[in-house]
Every structure is written in structure tokens, then in C-alpha cells.
Amino acid sequence: GTGLISLMLAQRNVSAKILAIDINENAVKLASENFRNSIFNENLKVELKDFKNFETNENFDLVVCNPPFFEKNASAKDVLARQQVELNFRNLVEKSTEIITKKGILSIILPSEAATDVKSLAAEFNLYLVREINIYGIEGGNLKRNILEFSLAQKPLEISDFVIEKSPRKYSDQYLNLTKNFHVFGK
């Protein structure tokens, strides 16, 4: 994508070295430009890579993925970015277990309907669910997304809910507090 998640991670962890990868050449160009314009540019790197075939001698403390949300054959404008054709959850989990440290974390943002399957899949690769955030678009609304964090090291499971809007076009205090260092806007 644009490198937004990497930029946010860099802002929160100023000493972290961040490698972003994407299979889409235009996305890599855009992320590269955004990284160059960032005050964190020395800690950010982007490469045109297919994660399935990603080779490295390094291990990572954190792998973050915001994968495509639509299954194959769904109607979508940007087919590659919106289909689980190039990188499916199995590929993601399997490759991540190869490159995270023993105490490392795999963090996946995904549609709520995929959460149960991804939890089962992670267990197949000896990953423990250590954190689950249930994301609601609006207070009282349906569960939309989950952030699932897995580790090779077993830890107590943390579960929390996160609400983006308390009413239409009115951000929740929770959202404003979390994003206050990334935006300037009023309540």
C-alpha cells in the first residue's frame, strides 16, 4: 500500500528498523516516496517482494500484515490488492513462523468472518493467540474486523473491543485517543 502502517510503527517506535514489502510495483513506489518524505526515513525500507518467496537471514520481532479482504472472484476494482490469490492466510502464517523470533509477534488485520479460520490455521503452525482486538465500525454495530496477534511463545490472552465511531461521523474517544498522534482533528 502506501506504507502508512510502517510509518505509524516508525512514529511509535523511533529506534525500530522497519522493512515493508509489497508485490505491487506502484504501491512500492508510493511507499518509497512517503518514506523519503518522513522524518523516520533512515529507519524505513521498502522492497518489491512476494512474501511467499521472501528470503532473509534475519528474524523479525514483529510481522504486521493487512492482507486483502476479499476472496477470489469477488468484484473489486484492484484485483491483485483485493484477492487472496497472491498471498493467502496459510502462506502468510507459514512464512511468518519461519521469520519471527521465538518471542516475536505476527499481527494480522482481517475481516471478522475470517478470524476463526485464521486462529485454527495459526494453531497448526504452533502459534499461540496472545491478543485479539474486536473492531466495531460504530458503537452497537456488528463486528467488522479483528486484529489477531500470534506468537511462538505462549502468553496470557488479551481480548479487547475497539469502537471507531460512537455515532455516524462522530469518532469515539477510544479512536481519538489512539490516533491523536497521527492526526489533527476535533471531536
Q: Which stretches of residues belong to each language-model region?
A:
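Conserved SAM-binding loop of SAM-dependent methyltransferases across substrates and taxa
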Residues: 2-15
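Conserved Class I SAM-dependent methyltransferase catalytic core
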Residues: 88-148
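A short acidic, Gly/Pro-enriched loop at the edge of an enzyme's catalytic core
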Residues: 52-63
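Conserved SAM-binding loop
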Residues: 31-32
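Mobile active-site "lid"/loop adjacent to the S-adenosyl-L-methionine
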Residues: 67-92
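SAM/dcSAM-binding transferase cores
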Residues: 142-187
